[in-house]
Amino acid sequence: MMTMTPRDLMRAQYVTRWQIVPTTRSQSVAQHSWAVAMLAMNLWCRRTGGQPGEAATDVELGKIAVMALWHDAPEVFTGDINTPTKIFLNASNALDELENTAGDGYLESMDGGPIRTCVKIADFLEAMYWLMEHGDGHYANNQLHGLNERFHQYLNEHAPLWRDSAVALWKELSDVNAETTTFQRVNYLKANDA
């Protein structure tokens, strides 16, 4: 079995996503995978009530991070694979054959169960967020709408126990009036730097 080399993995930072969807900026597979990992860990804590720093939670968060970082690794060989192409390739088992060449690390990280469900939901959330923030034009809006429909269909059919946590996270992400805490933290640090 072939395995991915470190040089193969480093190519993820150069493989761009959204080839057929107009966006206002580019995104690499590496950026996408990192964002999916962050969202999946947040979603896991929301769903389970766990907190980072708790031993059991940290073990699960580690597994989630690994799966999220690996989930699109085969795209270092193929480039970004858009959804219509994935549907076509899945029908012919070509994606399974490609994934089998990625090596044991990739295959082990893709085991099923609740962690895979969590990462799949985070993958949807990250893509919807990216299109909401950076999608450009009518076609991008149509893609966002279709992605949102597939997201809710996935929750209803495959992840009903995750629905409330996933929808709440999407509402938070899609709130255009929401603020980050960056400047609050800077001001706090300034005020307490004595």
Curated annotation (Swiss-Prot):
Keywords: ATP-binding, Cobalt, Hydrolase, Metal-binding, Nucleotide-binding. Catalyzes the hydrolysis of dATP, dADP and dAMP into dA. This step is essential for Z-genome synthesis (containing aminoadenine instead of adenine). Specifically removes dATP and its precursor dADP from the nucleotide pool of the host, preventing the incorporation of A into the phage genome and favoring the integration of the Z-base into the viral genome. GO terms for molecular function: ATP binding; hydrolase activity; metal ion binding. It holds the Pfam family YfbR-like. This is dATP triphosphohydrolase. It comes from Salmonella phage PMBT28. DATP binds at R17. Co(2+) 1 binds at H32, H71, D72, D123. Belongs to the Caudovirales dATP triphosphohydrolase family.
